[in-house]
UniProtKB/Swiss-Prot annotation:
Subcellular location as annotated: Cytoplasm
Protein keywords: Cytoplasm, Elongation factor, GTP-binding, Nucleotide-binding, Protein biosynthesis
Family the UniProt entry places it in: Belongs to the TRAFAC class translation factor GTPase superfamily. Classic translation factor GTPase family. EF-G/EF-2 subfamily.
Organism, scientific name: Salmonella arizonae (strain ATCC BAA-731 / CDC346-86 / RSK2980)
Protein name as catalogued: Elongation factor G
Keyword GTP-binding annotated: yes
Pfam family, any one: GTP_EFTU_D2
């Protein structure tokens, strides 16, 4: 089967935004204008097509990033049909993992900002993730029809808060109730969309006289940004020659692809204005799979030899599984992005991370939660496979003859955990299956059994994250659960270096004895300097401990890290240097050295100024001005560090850093302090030393 759309006409894009910036409505309009969706779904009445899980419709927030395919030939039908694969990404802090995961497989992104709220804390998180994966992006300033809408203010915030270089492609004509259309700064024409057909048709008109000066000024800014793309254009521009529309677009495209500028468009998705021109900008300025660098990976040859795959049908098949979802009718859906080659339904592929073969039974392309079965997928495609047995997020699927492991994704450690138990004993097994399924879908969610209490513990990125997991167990698996009080994921660390700590395990009880003896130094590592949070250096000279016992020493210490001596929490940022010891020809064994190492570790840890670390959250509260004092007072009582505040149209925005343990039940308290008028966002920032009194209380509560 030949390719229907050339790969240069593909756009794999994500649409990402802060909660309530109007991203779902924007996506809905895209689906409407691209002709997929004939009745526009509104989030306000829970009918949006992309939000396909029930809780999303109830809460009006987008949780699962669904992948949808649409076609676009331009507002004025000026292009050949382009295939746009849209990954919808959530805007709520607790679902940052979904954003990270979709950023990994995108080629470009549209950042949606609210014209009133501007750049919000979650926008900064998403921005950092897009930077990490070097995703070229454009911005869409939405909700221009709302009270307090201000396009150029948001452009300023993109510069100051995100450190980006925003270049407006348009200006808004009017604002709030008076918002009627946009000025196209490339063509220097006003665009007015037709309300009668929900903005499907439009007219180019002259720029309103009272906006001509402003339009000239920003047109100049656009031309200068384009001219900076190359020396030839700069010479042409400085020589007073006009740049053609084609030259301007090509130059801006080049700079967007190089991540040098962010082109900014605006509109009101709700009022059917602006999304159409933003789609044109996606085609004009965002990359196709062939415009982005080849994907890097390593060969599965035991040597981790670097390799790459180019976006071409002629290269061996390689794809990355970026999301697992459970579908009530067909079971497991594995969403994957094809980076190279072609695969047909019925083909056998290799999961190179797990070295297991998988058969592609059925392949479907998703339109939100409707699916269309297809026979093959090619480089650049995003699709879902039904019935893969053992594939997890981040696994590589590839041609068995040409194995490669594509870059793995990194997932954050959970910061909050709660105990769960089924309401009826009979549901115990069902609950285990449900939690296993959900953990497979979401790598930032963990499940384990507490060895001491035998309780099932679930852990995630925040209270809302865990609420939704419990909710999904009830809806999708029919398991009702009781949940315990949230527990904070503390950590333990040391603050001083200790040297020559001895650990000796010697036993003689008739017959063969046990003998292991080690001498170690322990030292703190700079937080975040080592991804594992642990390093082991073997400095044994002259064979005082034979080489075969060294891994046992390392293992003995690593086993102790899982449950630290202070309060049984994991130990992080620790370095160990093994430099002396002794052994016995007959009595020494791996077990004896493992035990000797654990004795030395416990001894050294006590002497190395041990501390308890607590998770600190970055909290931003938006409150009416008259409640500012109360809100700040309350944050201080919660051991919050005030980091600053600024005035907004809607009130005051307060920035603080607060320990997670003090934030439980904050939503309720904030509601009563401000009569429900304030809102807040919270995301994990860092681990920091807990004050003595807090640490003492935690240690006593753990019975250590």
């Amino acid at each position: 089967m030949a390719r229907t759309t050339p790969i240069a006409r593909y756009r794999n894009i994500g649409i990402s935004a802060h909660i309530d910036a109007g991203k779902t409505t924007t996506t809905e309009r895209i689906l409407f204008y691209t002709g997929v969706n004939h009745k526009i779904g509104e989030v306000h009445d829970g009918a949006a097509t992309m939000d396909w899980m029930e809780q999303e419709q109830e809460r009006g927030i987008t949780i699962t990033s669904a992948a949808t395919t649409a076609f676009w030939s331009g507002m004025a039908k000026q292009y050949e049909p382009h295939r746009i694969n849209i990954i919808d990404t959530p805007g709520h802090v607790d679902f940052t993992i979904e954003v990270e995961r979709s950023m990994r497989v995108l080629d470009g992104a549209v950042m949606v900002y609210c014209a009133v709220g501007g750049v919000q804390p979650q926008s900064e998180t998403v921005w950092r993730q897009a930077n990490k994966y070097k995703v070229p992006r454009i911005a869409f300033v939405n909700k221009m029809d709302r009270m307090g809408a201000n396009f150029l203010k948001v452009v300023g915030q993109i510069k100051t808060r995100l450190g980006a270089n925003p270049v407006p492609l348009q200006l808004a004509i009017g604002a709030e109730e008076g918002f009627t259309g946009v000025v196209d700064l490339v063509k220097m024409k006003a665009i007015n969309w037709n309300d009668a057909d929900q903005g499907v048709t439009f007219e180019y008109e002259d720029i309103p006289a009272d906006m001509q000066d402003l339009a000239d000024e920003w047109h100049q800014n656009l031309i200068e940004s384009a001219a900076e793309a190359s020396e030839e254009l700069m010479e042409k521009y400085l020589g007073g020659e006009e740049l053609t529309e084609e030259e301007i677009k090509q130059a801006l495209r080049q700079r967007v692809l190089n991540n040098e500028i962010i082109l900014v468009t605006c509109g009101s998705a709700f009022k059917n204005k602006g999304v159409q021109a933003m789609l044109d900008a996606v085609i004009d300025y965002l990359p196709s799979p062939v415009d982005v660098p080849a994907i890097n990976g390593i060969l599965d040859d035991g040597k981790d030899t670097p390799a790459e795959r180019h976006a071409s049908d002629d290269e061996p098949f390689s794809a990355l599984a970026f999301k697992i979802a459970t579908d009530p009718f067909v079971g497991n859906l594995t969403f994957f992005r094809v980076y190279s080659g072609v695969v047909n339904s019925g083909d056998t592929v290799l999961n190179s991370v797990k070295t297991a073969r998988e058969r592609f039974g059925r392949i479907v392309q998703m339109h939100a939660n409707k699916r269309e079965e297809i026979k093959e997928v090619r480089a650049g495609d995003i699709a879902a496979a039904i019935g893969l047995k053992d594939v997890t997020t981040g696994d590589t699927l590839c041609d068995p003859e040409n194995p490669i492991i594509l870059e793995r994704m990194e997932f954050p450690e959970p910061v909050i955990s709660i105990a769960v138990e089924p309401k009826t004993k009979a549901d115990q097994e069902k609950m285990g299956l449900a939690l296993g399924r959900l953990a497979k879908e979401d790598p930032s969610f963990r499940v384990w059994t507490d060895e001491e209490s035998n309780q099932t513990i679930i852990a995630g990125m925040g209270e809302l994250h865990l609420d939704i997991i419990v909710d999904r167990m009830k809806r999708e698996f029919n398991v009702e659960a009781n949940v315990g009080k949230p527990q904070v994921a503390y950590r333990e660390a040391i603050r001083a270096k200790v040297t020559d700590i001895e650990g000796k395990h010697a036993k003689q009880s008739g017959g063969r004895g046990q003998y292991g003896h080690v001498v170690i130094d322990m030292y703190p590592l700079e937080p975040g300097s080592n991804p594992k949070g642990y390093e082991f250096i073997n400095d044994i000279k002259g064979g005082v401990i034979p080489g075969e016992y060294i891994p046992a020493v390392d293992k003995g210490i690593q086993e102790q890290l899982k449950s630290g001596p202070l309060a049984g929490y994991p130990v992080v940022d620790l370095g160990v240097r093994l430099h002396f010891g002794s052994y016995h020809d007959v009595d020494s064994s791996e077990l004896a050295f493992k035990l000797a190492a654990s004795i030395a570790f416990k001894e050294g840890f006590k002497k190395a100024k041990p501390v308890l670390l607590e998770p600190i959250m970055k909290v931003e509260v938006e409150t009416p001005e008259e409640n500012t004092g109360d809100v700040i007072g309350d944050l201080s009582r919660r051991r919050g560090m005030l980091k600053g505040q600024e005035s907004e149209v809607t009130g005051v925005k307060i920035h603080a850093e607060v320990p997670l343990s003090e934030m439980f039940g904050y939503a309720t308290q904030l509601r009563s302090l401000t009569k429900g008028r304030a809102s807040y966002t919270m995301e994990f920032l860092k681990y920091d030393d807990a004050p003595n009194n807090v640490a003492q209380a935690v240690i006593e509560a753990r019975g250590k």
